[in-house]
Amino acid sequence: MVKLAKGAKTQAKPKKAAPPPPKDMEDSEEEEDMEEDDSSDEEVEVPVKKTPAKKTATPAKATPGKAATPGKKGATPAKNGKQAKKQESEEEEDDSDEEAEDQKPIKNKPVAKKAVAKKEESEEDDDDEDESEEEKAVAKKPTPAKKPAGKKQESEEEDDEESEDEPMEVAPALKGKKTAQAAEEDDEEEDDDDEEDDDDEEEQQGSAKRKKEMPKTIPEAKKTKTDTASEGLSIFIGNLNSTKEFDELKDALREFFSKKNLTIQDIRIGNSKKFGYVDFSSEEEVEKALKLTGKKILGTEVKIEKAMAFDKNKTAENKKERDSRTLFVKNIPYSTTVEELQEIFENAKDIRIPTGKDGSNKGIAYVEFSNEDEANKALEEKQGAEIEGRSIFVDFTGEKSQNSGNKKGPEGDSKVLVVNNLSYSATEDSLREVFEKATSIRIPQNQGRAKGFAFIEFSSAEDAKDAMDSCNNTEIEGRSIRLEFSQGGGPQGGGRGGSAQSKTLFVRGLSEDTTEETLKEAFDGSVNARIVTDRDTGASKGFGFVDFSTAEDAKAAKEAMEDGEIDGNKVTLDFAKPKGDSQRGGRGGFGRGGGFRGGRGGRGGGGGRGFGGRGGGRGRGGFGGRGGGGFRGGQGGGFRGGQGKKMRFDD
């Protein structure tokens, strides 16, 4: 730095012979000193700088330095300044302290002090200095274009500002014109940059608005799909050839109906490609299309029905009214046909026997009558009637079923017993030998194999209680059975039967077009249905829940709809679990929570995956129960829990 200072001295000597500048120059220099002192709030050495500046402000010596001072940020185009900047930028950080001491004998001592002071100021508050200097530049000289150029240079190289102080003392004042031209060009470039920034901001704001508007348009699109259906101008087409592509199906449907001189407004194919909806322009065309059911499209016979448009209140009333005149019949032989049931229920308006994949019935049926009085009469007359040696059980569906059949007895006990620990080889006949008063016996099976338990139904709670007292721990097919009351009633309650006695079914695999009304309509005896939808789009998530008045109705509906279809989609059924009846977490130890595999937390398990792992990683496992967490901590954190931070241990 001493060499550079000497170089500055030698280059400044030829300027001593130059004629003294006009007096205006000296005045402007003093004004600049005053303005520079005012522009910096943190410059402590202000009085020291002002006094020597006035003493040494001789025309020959101070003119180059003072002319260069405002050019500190604006005259960077000077060649000498760039070369000196490159040399100093490598050593400025290490030699900043030496620079102040080495420059004491130099005649331009006030200028050096200013450079050091400005270096300290630029490190502490570059942004404030930029703003203040930019504002002061307007009132300084007749050449204010130098300051904006300095601002641009400073914004690009803020960290290298101090390196420009001394080189500018060497820069001759004669190059001020070139600097002004460069500054004007920089002003134009800055204006262009500002315009481009404004354009970018407008584009970003516009794109953000478009993104916000996107979710709003989705529900509107969904509404238009159902508009035609609500007007009764849509048909439902089932049993489509799902092996074809969506476009193939649409083209085939369009060609099929156009040959029949029918005008199509829109075609919608379900995700499974097994069904679709076709909109027409008039009711007359819909009636013509309905007559085409059973015709082949792409090699399969299609089923054509009128698309349902539901009035929620009206549908609920119709459902309740129909349930009041519909009977639910259980314990019928698997070979029973509709004709055989028609012989027993002579006044029945409609009889439905749910069937499985193999076409055989599931031991239940629904019998609908013209009015509620006929249903009541049939219930009284046909209760316990025999079909092929089996005594049938008759009850109402829906809400009315609570008044008869499966209701609890006067003492609050259930009329249904659950038989646990049942031999897999046990049959209905072997159970009937033990439970002689049973009105219905059902052995749930999985792929033709018994599940190890059964349901025994009696005509009264008293009969069920007697069977519990006399038959519990009886041996059937070599195994001692264990009895309990269904629906959590009786001395033992709960158990497998209690957990299975849910009144709500969980339905998966629903079509995106299935509504809560169609879902409820699909299950005889249901009292309510709800479909889970996406909060943002309102679209169905493909699953829902169906509520029943009793657990027995839910079980019967599950059996009836097993492997069934709703709106062309095959659905999967299961009993819904009450909230809080979850098995997450386990009970620590070597079980589902803690242990060697960790589980999901547990209660004081032994960690898992070494010391803590998954078992203690959620604040309830590890070595110390709550907040344990082992070495890895997780949310519990370390040995003592703490605030949820992981703790490190050095090797």
Swiss-Prot record:
Compartments annotated for it: namely: Nucleus, Nucleolus
Residues with the modification Phosphoserine, per the entry, are S155
Compositional bias, Acidic residues, is annotated for 26-45, 89-101, 122-134, 155-168, 183-204
Q: Where is the composition biased (Gly residues)?
A: 585-644
Give the compositionally biased regions (Basic and acidic residues): 219-228
State the SMART domains in the record. RRM (SM00360)
Compositionally biased residues, Basic residues: 106-116
- Which residues are in the RRM domain? 233-309, 325-399, 415-488, 503-578
Function of the protein = Nucleolin is the major nucleolar protein of growing eukaryotic cells. It is found associated with intranucleolar chromatin and pre-ribosomal particles. It induces chromatin decondensation by binding to histone H1. It is thought to play a role in pre-rRNA transcription and ribosome assembly.
Q: What is this protein called?
A: Nucleolin
**What is the source species?**
Xenopus laevis (African clawed frog)
Source taxonomy lineage? Eukaryota, Metazoa, Chordata, Craniata, Vertebrata
